[in-house]
């Protein structure tokens, strides 16, 4: 019910732009491609009378305009490299599965091979556009990369990137802050955490120092302290470059860090659509059947609201579960002190190496401070169908719920 059919295909839009001599970078029509032919990707290969030919898809032109070009006419080494790598990758898989008899030297590619190469090229273009879209919409300096070396899955069709909570119709999120601390050198006895009855969450190195279950109160937009205040961490956004990547063990998309992350460092927020608990129960039944887990109850103080990151979210939407995670959830209050609507922040529980996948426990048990009154302040929304866990941890519980 959430999908809306396109009014025109990408190729139709490209052809219209070309006829009207209009450039549109988002659909691949640039001033450069309007003036001259530009190779978008290579589709096929053949040898005729000793000459190698490649079938070329021209940027901004429909596939019906593809032409065979001799190797010496090509001036696209990267695209040729992609073509050869995709071909070798596919043939290698076929040899392993013995599903296709292949030879190292061929005069023409089998249709199934050429079809895979074209799909891979289209996927590469789609993922590149998605990466550019994510980086346009993010509100932090660190980069977001996208990578899929596993299958032909492209960008999610019904996912919209947001940087903060999106209240559902009928829900009003009011930032009730009208005053802030008078500190010029936080923290002091009258700093925001102390005024709320808690200790400062960070040490001098801006690393987390409190136990799980305790809330984080950061300085807000009315405070006198500047942007370098040691109590302004979560509000600055993700400080690390991250990569959304396709996992090779059936867990769909995942997220890995491209930089080393030290212990107790802020990594990212979990954002999504804020809905009522009643609506969460209704949606939960749908998600259960799909095997998805995107609902989080905001039950730090009450059980009135839930965050649904299925359609609206940020990079955290793609973070997988692990029974032995390297991220921990904390409730954060900044410009909104409504205890029913804490912000959800993910902090590292240990040093995470560059290239390592980021995970958190969807049940968030084990490392929680059970002596705290708010130890169960944030928990995944109740689920009715058990989902098998594929985290692979030695301590795996077998199920996500």
Predicted regions and their residues:
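Eukaryotic short linear interaction motifs
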Residues: 49-52, 62-66, 92, 175, ...
């Amino acid at each position: 019910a959430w999908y809306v059919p396109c009014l025109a295909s990408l190729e139709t839009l490209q052809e219209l732009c070309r006829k009207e001599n209009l450039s549109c970078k988002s659909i691949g029509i640039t001033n450069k491609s309007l003036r001259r032919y530009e190779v978008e990707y290579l589709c096929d290969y053949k040898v005729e009378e000793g000459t190698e030919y490649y079938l070329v898809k021209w940027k901004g032109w429909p596939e019906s305009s593809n032409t065979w070009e001799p190797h010496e006419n090509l001036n696209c080494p990267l695209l040729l490299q992609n073509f050869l790598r995709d071909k070798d990758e596919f043939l290698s898989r076929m040899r392993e599965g013995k599903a296709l008899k292949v030879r190292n030297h061929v005069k023409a590619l089998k249709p199934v091979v050429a079809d895979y190469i074209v799909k891979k090229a289209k996927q590469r273009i789609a993922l590149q556009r998605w990466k550019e879209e994510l980086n346009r919409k993010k509100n932090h300096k660190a980069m977001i990369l996208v990578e899929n070396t596993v299958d032909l899955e492209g960008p999610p069709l019904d996912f919209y990137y947001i940087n903060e909570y999106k209240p559902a119709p009928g829900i009003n999120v009011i930032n009730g802050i009208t005053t802030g601390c008078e500190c010029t050198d936080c923290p002091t006895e009258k700093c925001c955490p102390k005024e709320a009855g808690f200790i400062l969450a960070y040490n001098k190195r801006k690393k987390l120092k409190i136990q799980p279950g305790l809330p984080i109160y950061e300085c807000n937009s009315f405070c006198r302290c500047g942007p370098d205040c040691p109590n302004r961490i979560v509000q600055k956004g993700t400080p690390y470059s991250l990569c959304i990547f396709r996992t090779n063990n059936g867990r769909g998309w995942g997220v890995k860090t491209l930089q080393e992350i030290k212990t107790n460092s802020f990594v990212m927020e979990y954002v999504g659509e804020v809905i009522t608990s009643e609506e969460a129960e209704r949606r939960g039944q749908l998600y259960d059947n799909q095997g998805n887990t995107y609902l989080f109850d905001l039950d730090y103080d009450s059980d009135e609201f839930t965050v649904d990151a299925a359609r609206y979210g940020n990079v955290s939407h793609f973070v997988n579960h692990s029974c032995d995670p390297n991220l921990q959830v904390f409730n954060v209050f900044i410009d909104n002190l409504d205890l029913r609507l804490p912000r959800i922040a993910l902090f590292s529980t240990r040093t995470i190496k560059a290239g390592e996948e980021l995970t958190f426990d969807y049940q968030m048990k084990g490392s929680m401070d059970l002596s705290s009154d708010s130890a169960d302040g944030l928990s995944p929304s109740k689920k009715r169908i058990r989902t098998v866990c594929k985290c692979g941890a030695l301590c795996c519980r077998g199920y996500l719920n």
